[in-house]
Structures are given as C-alpha cells and as structure tokens.
C-alpha cells in the first residue's frame, strides 16, 4: 500500500514525538516494589520504608507510596533503570511528596545517580548527578533544592525556591533543557525558571573588575558640600543647660554641713544646638565611581552544562526527625507535555478527594474534642456540686453539734446545784 507524502511525514512525526520514559513508579503491584528498590547496607540503622497511602488519601490504592516509618533516622533506598544520557534532549524529573506528619525537619528530595552507584552502599556522600526536591527544617528552611554535580562539585542554585509545607500531596517537577535553561514546577505550575549559567555558579564570571583601573584621586563622590560662604552667627553658641533663675537656696541650708549650694540646672531656651553650615550642590560632583570591567580571561562558555553521560539510579537519601512522608508517582522522561499529563492523571485526579477526606477527619476530630471537653466540664461541675453538697452537710452537722452543746450547758448547771 502506498502512502501519501503528507501522511508518511505525519506518521514519522508521531514516531519522533513518542516520549521516552526512562523510569516510572506508581507502586500499583502491592509488595512488588520490594524487588525493584534496594536498601543500602552502608549503615545498620537506616530507617525503613513501608508501602502506605497514609492516614488520608484521595484513592487508597493509587495514593500508595513509600512512607518513612521511623523517627530520627537516615533513609537510603534506591531503584535502578536502563542507563541513558540526556545529551541533546530534555530531562524531566517528577514525583509527589506528602508530609502528612506536619514535618518539622526532614528531606523530601530525590537524587539521580549514574548507574555506577553501588546501591547496597549508597549513603550521604555518594556522588550524584542531580538532587531535586523539598527540604524543611524549622521556620528558616522551607526550600526546593536544585543541585547539579558539575565537574565533581555540587553546585547549589542561587535563588530561593519556597516549597509547600502543608500536610497534602504535592507534585514537584524539574525540567532541564539542552539549551541550558531550566524550569521548576510545583503542582504543575511554574515557580521558577531561567538559565543554568545565570542561576548557578558553574563557570567563572564573564566579566571581572579591571585590575589596572583605580579611582582617580580627584574623583569627587560628594553630592552636597558645605557652603563656603556660610558662617556661624555670633550669638549662636549658648550653653545647653543653665542654672534655674527661679531656684532659691532653702532656708535651712547649712553650707558647713551641706556644702556650697548650687541651683539646679534647666534646659536653656536659647540653646540652638550644634551649628552646621548649609549644604549646596557640589560643583565638582562626578557621581559614584564605578570600577570598569573587562572580559574575564578565565571564562569559557560551556554549552553542555545541562548534559550528563549517564543516569541509572534514582535514590531516596535523606534524614527525617519526624517520619511519615510518602513518595509516589516517580517519573523520568524527556517529554514535558507527557510529564504534565502524567501529573494530572495521578496527583491531579486524587488531590481534591484527599483534601475532602482530611477535612472530614479534621471535623470529626473537632467534634470529638468538643464532646470530650463538654464531658470533662460536666464531670467537673458534678464534682464541684458534690463538693458543695458535702460542704453544706458538714456545716449543718457543725451547727447541730453547736446547738446540742448549748442545750447541755443549763442542764449541767442544774445538776451541780
């Protein structure tokens, strides 16, 4: 069958546009994940991950992911995939994070390693290619890390990207393009973008201050100067404080005993403060001197900053004070549109139901606490009432006792007579 040229080109276009999915993990096969993910044995006390959808969710099965389960632990777990290079193509790294424990300090990021990583020995100092995701510790650290390993050095972004710090599931996406640009998205909305060269210190600066240049000695940066024709008035200088003219020495003042009497001082109404000449525009003002710059001889552009020869492992290498974070919906691809669609079909489908379930739980908890508080108050009121009744009975008994004693006194006197 012969195909027309337009149809053939269209089919070829579809084939070219087919996204490459290098890694995808949704944990939809129960315990099957345990055969794909490898625990590091570098330390014997690494925390354990469990499969869970958490205390609240949008879909109990779809929302199952890897959950940290032990407080104050380091975690080290990784999964491998067919090695690939992102040279000449876009790289998209995406996953969801849910800090349902209202995290106080802990990581929620992932690391991408080359396939040379020994997964059984993965640890905090294992060299990685990219680290990406949220990190929270106290009120001061609530950021999205985007760290690239460039020529053996981990280089941090120069911008502060704020992460989500609530208890719900959020979608984090990093896009790195072959034109050395990047984009960070949270919940499929852009929160940062720009140039790799501009926003990371991968390379020496393009320009440096000219080492041979210096500010001329006669360069005047003063915008205003004292008016040379202005002079201080002759009657300007007055003391700030003067003796109180209305003060009188007390009649009983004894100078031999009390010393020489001195009147108290008061603020001088004629005091004018420090005299300063008026200011005028400086006729020699040249503005702030700016150090001229020259091309940095150490600078050399690198069009391949974005590129890595080998990706082969995705790892969760982190520390958490309070456990409970759930990681899910991992995706590594070369297609931005596919990643966005995948995010909408996973996180996007269940986010509303997740919030509804959480809101319902919160309302039930609120009503429970109200009922418990009401019951506690009723019990306290009942105890107070019982105490009051006991007190009244004690007072009545005391009054009866006193009356009996009063009646006994006359009878005793009669018997004595």
Swiss-Prot record:
Disulfide bonding pattern of the chain: 105-137
| Localization terms from the record | Endoplasmic reticulum lumen; Cytoplasm, Cytosol; Secreted, Extracellular space, Extracellular matrix; Cell surface
Q: Where is this region: N-domain?
A: 18-197
What is the designated name of this protein? Calreticulin
Q: Which portions of the sequence form the region 4 X approximate repeats? A: 191-255
Primary site of residence: endoplasmic reticulum
Which family would the database say this protein is a member of? Belongs to the calreticulin family.
Q: State whether it acts alone or in a complex, and with which partners, per the record.
A: Monomer. Component of an EIF2 complex at least composed of CELF1/CUGBP1, CALR, CALR3, EIF2S1, EIF2S2, HSP90B1 and HSPA5. Interacts with PDIA3/ERp57 and SPACA9. Interacts with TRIM21. Interacts with NR3C1. Interacts with PPIB. Interacts (via P-domain) with PDIA5. Interacts with GABARAP. Interacts with HLA-E-B2M and HLA-G-B2M complexes. Interacts with HLA-F. Interacts with CLCC1.
Q: Report the InterPro entries cross-referenced here.
A: Calret/calnex (IPR001580), Calret/calnex_CS (IPR018124), Calreticulin (IPR009169), Calreticulin/calnexin_P_dom_sf (IPR009033), ConA-like_dom_sf (IPR013320)
One GO biological process this protein is involved in is: protein maturation
Keywords on record: Acetylation, Calcium, Chaperone, Cytoplasm, Cytoplasmic vesicle, Disulfide bond, Endoplasmic reticulum, Extracellular matrix, Glycoprotein, Hydroxylation, Lectin, Lysosome, Metal-binding, Repeat, Sarcoplasmic reticulum, Secreted, Signal, Zinc
Which of the residues bear the PTM N6-(2-hydroxyisobutyryl)lysine? 64
Query: At what positions is N6-acetyllysine found?
Result: 48, 159, 209
| Binding of an alpha-D-glucoside, residues | 109, 111, 128, 135, 317
Q: Where is this region: 3 X approximate repeats?
A: 259-297
Span(s) of short sequence motif Prevents secretion from ER: 414-417
What residue spans carry the region label C-domain? 309-417
Linked pathology: CALR somatic mutations are frequently found in myeloproliferative neoplasms lacking JAK2 or MPL mutations. Myeloproliferative neoplasms are chronic myeloid cancers characterized by overproduction of mature blood cells, and may evolve into acute myeloid leukemia. In addition to chronic myeloid leukemia with the BCR-ABL fusion gene, the three most common myeloproliferative neoplasms are essential thrombocythemia, polycythemia vera, and myelofibrosis.
Instruction: Supply the PROSITE patterns for this chain.
Output: CALRETICULIN_1, CALRETICULIN_2, CALRETICULIN_REPEAT, ER_TARGET
Q: Which segments does the entry list as coiled coil?
A: none
